[in-house]
Every structure is written in C-alpha cells, then in structure tokens.
Amino acid sequence: MALLQISEPGLSAAPHQRRLAAGIDLGTTNSLVATVRSGQAETLADHDGRHLLPSVVHYQQQGHTVGYAARANAAQDTANTISSVKRMMGRSLADIQTRYPHLPYQFQASENGLPMIETAAGLLNPVRISADILKALAARATEALSGELDGVVITVPAYFDDAQRQGTKDAARLAGLHVLRLLNEPTAAAIAYGLDSGKEGVIAVYDLGGGTFDISILRLSRGVFEVLATGGDSALGGDDFDHLLADYIREQAGIADRSDNRVQRELLDAAIAAKIALSDADSVSVNVAGWQGDITREQFNDLIAALVKRTLMACRRALKDAGVEAQEVLEVVMVGGSTRVPLVRERVGEFFGRPPLTAIDPDKVVAIGAAIQADILVGNKPDSEMLLLDVIPLSLGLETMGGLVEKVIPRNTTIPVARAQDFTTFKDGQTAMSIHVMQGERELVQDCRSLARFALRGLPAMPAGGAHIRVTFQVDADGLLSVTAMEKSTGVEASIQVKPSYGLTDSEIATMIQDSMSFAEQDVKARMLAEQKVEAARVLESLTGALAADAALLSAAERQVIDDAAAHLSEVAQSDDGDAIEQAIKNVDKQTQEFAARRMDKSVRRALQGHSVDEV
C-alpha cells in the first residue's frame, strides 16, 4: 500500500528542495540580476558575458528590445528608445517636465496627471516600461537557473516614496514576478559587505548611481542591520556628470543646435565614453559630429566638483541625523558605477578620513545583497538570524484641534513598525471624526505635508472627551503606510492606505528637516499658543453647555460675572497673546468654581433621590 505524503500547510512537500530566488537591482542607467548558488551570491551574465543590462527599452510596432540592443537604437530612434525611466516612476507629468525639460520624448498626461510616453507601440507609462526591463532580467535568471523564480527582492533608492515603491511593485507584478520584498539599495549593499567581511559598528553607504544619490548611516551588530539615518538626492547621479560633460563638449565643438536628437545622442554617448576612460587615463580624445579634441581629467573634475560637493553636504546632514561623527564611521561602502570616478573616491575618502571600500564591484554590490536577502526570504536559509531594519525619512502624525500636528511615528523610526495612539472627541454629541494624516517635522499643519484624509463615522453620541478612538499607524517593510481608526466601545472602524500619486523630492525632504531645526523655537511658541486657543475654546464650549443646563443655580449678579469672564476669554482667544489667554482661562475657572460646586451638589442630590442612608 502506498504511503500518503503529508507536508506542513504552506510548505513544499519536498522541504529540502531548494527554491529559486533572485535579487534585482532595478537601476536608472543599468540593471542587474543576481542569485545565490553553492552558498555564494553572484550576478548573472547574458550570452555575451555581460552582467549589466542597460535600463533602456526600444519600442516598435511589432515588439520591443531591452538592454544593449535597445541602446544601439538610441541615436537613430530617440523618441522610441526610453532610458532612465526610473526617474519618472511615481512622478506627475508636470513634475517630470519641470525637472527634466530636455527629455526627447512626447508625453501625454493620464487622467490622474501621470506621464504617458508616445511610442510606436502606443502610449506607455513608466510602470509598463519598467516591467519590460524586469521581464528581461527574469528571463536571464530563469534560463541560468533552469526554472521559474519563486520570488524576487527588488532594490529601490532609500528616498523612494510610497508612490514610487508601489509603482515598482506594480511593474514586478506586471512582469509576472512574486515580490518577496522591496529593499533599500544602501541596505542591500550593507548586507553584501556585512556578510562578506563581518564588520560590526557604524558604516556609511555612499551610493552614487546613474540617476540617484543615497547616503545611509547604518549600524551592523551581530547580524542586525539598522539604518540610523538616510539622506540623498533622487535627481543627482552619474547621468548628471554625463550631461555636464556633453554640454562642455558641445561648447568646445561649437554645436549650437539642440533640436537634433541624433546629435544630442552622439554627444551624450561621447561624454559617457570619455567619463569612463578618464577613470584610468589623464586625458582622452573625443571625436563627435565632425569635431575632434582632447578632454582632461582635470577639466572633467572642474565640471563635476559642485555635484560631488552636494553629495558630501548630504553626507554631513545624514551624520547629524544619526548623531554620529565622521570619525566614528568604521567603513565607507561605495555603491554605484559613478563611484569609480577618481574625484568621487578622493573626496569621499577625505570627508570620512579613510579610504572607501571597493572590494565588491560597486555596480554589483546592491544586486548581490538583494540576492542574499531573497535567498533568506524564499526559505532557503530558515535558520538565518539576520535582521533588517530600515527607517522612515519623515515623521508621520495626525492633525489635532487648533491646526496642530501630533506625531505618531517619529522620523528615522525603524520599519516595519506599528504605533497606536488614543484620541477623543472635542464636542458634546460628536458622532464623526475627520482623520487627517500628516507628514513632516513642524508643529503646525500649515507647515507639514498632507498625505490623506478620511472620516470615522458612527461614533456614539457622548459628552466631549467621552469617546475613545484608537488610531493605528502601520508602515510595512516596503515603506507603505496604512492608518486605521477605531472607536473602542463600538468597534466602529475606518482605514486608508496612503498611496499618493506622486511624492516629495529628496531636496524637499531635506528642506523640511532643515526648516524644523531653523524654526524650532518659533514652532514651539506657535504650538503653545495654539494649545492655549484650543483650551480656551474647550472651556467656552463646556461653559456654554453648563449654563444652558443649570443657569437657574446662579443669581443675576453671579451670571453677569461669569458672562463677563467668558466674554473676555472669547476676545483674548482671538489674539496671539498666549499669556493673556492663559490668565483669562484661569479667571473663568476662578469665577465658575462656585457654579461647578453647585452643579455637583445638584447631581449628587439627584443620584440620591429615593434612596435611604442605609442603601448608600
């Protein structure tokens, strides 16, 4: 008789069968796919031995090509050859056209203002284009591993907001991939170096790719990866080096026409080739559009010096956020092909006071880290003790009475995280509450960013302060925020998942953080004033209700004194004199103490009516 084969629910009937997983570095300029084989993480090459896949897609009516074949068409068919699509992910069309006015594509806006690119294959959005790149990477992995992938980990810049992260996940699903997790690129690099060299302590991950710059300060200790702080610029990278050098070559060659897309592409290709050559040579010969000349490393350094300085300013801010001095950083990990530029390595070494780590190919280190994490998440290393902690870049909270922001999850809190806080009603008989989710570091709503609004209805009619509403903020491992509000006594609940159509830029995040420090004293005073005004409104609301119910307990003279005190409080509450408001509140309290005592006596007498002393 055959034996029944029984396995644990949700697990393979062959528990020792290795699952196929991959780590994908979906980059602005180039992308890679890596996996763990025989205990070693490695990037996978194409049939020609090339590990990098240019993040370029060329569209035609009958199909498309991805990578090197697509990039070869860039000069001849610029409008249908889409590159650096990662920069468009999660952004509005207006934002893209403002930031990147020289993109050689024809755009249309979707119904919600997101970009659609006109191609020979029709209107395509950044999610679809990214999906085509992911499909090419997945096909490479499937062929190399001789099987379909059980799951992937895809890396994203640390500063990607909710919309950009969600767009990346949507692209993966469109490509037919099961996303195990989105992983911050600097964190992936920390995984790669943490496992290879076993370093413990504080490290800096300096990630300068084609289109983005990220700096992360991390603490590695006994397998725990904790991001202390992040910073960067989602619109700064090696592409900007290329464009500066291309503009310089244009000036030297005397090319005035910017409308010829083919010449534009030739200039950019020449600039990229020159940049790469100047990493090893002191000068390089350039031949473009009939012009021939030499470019020196010194000239190139002069062009990019300001951009490199910008990255170091972000490093300084991140160190300050982490509460760490530069000399406390044990190692500096270099990530991204642009870190091969000698000036970058030199300036970074000077800033941190130590030569940066470059043992792992900076182009491959992120994909390798993602592959290691994917191998764990897919279940190939169930005994792994590695823990990964990322952080949120800006505080999350709610609007409260008076236009104040109550922070629920502070900036740089590790994720995933869930925090709950109790709130209550302001008015008697209030049956609904508006939940306004905020993001930012300032004290007032007007100085922070609105993320979402929703209403909790069906609250039991109670006196002010009687209802208890628990609001829970939950940020998952991908940085996506869910907010739930529930009234405790009835279980009435409402929730929202925050997916803004487009989010903040890194420079705006940095500005918000800087403003919170610059205006700290002013904000505290403004908050104190707002709180005084809210308290004044609460006192007046309560007094109005009390007088409506029990005015008969007062003589005409007593009522006049209380009315005068209330009128004075109502008047000063409109001013910005916090001390005067505080004194007026105290005066109302003083003038109504006897009234409050009489109301209490009345309530006690009513409660005792019909009962004997023995019963009490």
UniProtKB/Swiss-Prot annotation:
InterPro entries: ATPase_NBD, Heat_shock_70_CS, HscA_NBD, HSP70_C_sf, HSP70_peptide-bd_sf, Hsp_70_fam, ISC_FeS_clus_asmbl_HscA. It holds the Pfam family HSP70. GO terms for biological process: iron-sulfur cluster assembly. GO terms for molecular function: ATP binding; ATP hydrolysis activity; ATP-dependent protein folding chaperone; unfolded protein binding. Disulfide bonds: none annotated. It comes from the Bacteria. Keywords: ATP-binding, Chaperone, Nucleotide-binding. PANTHER family: HEAT SHOCK PROTEIN 70KDA. Belongs to the heat shock protein 70 family. Chaperone involved in the maturation of iron-sulfur cluster-containing proteins. Has a low intrinsic ATPase activity which is markedly stimulated by HscB. Involved in the maturation of IscU. This is Chaperone protein HscA. The gene is hscA.
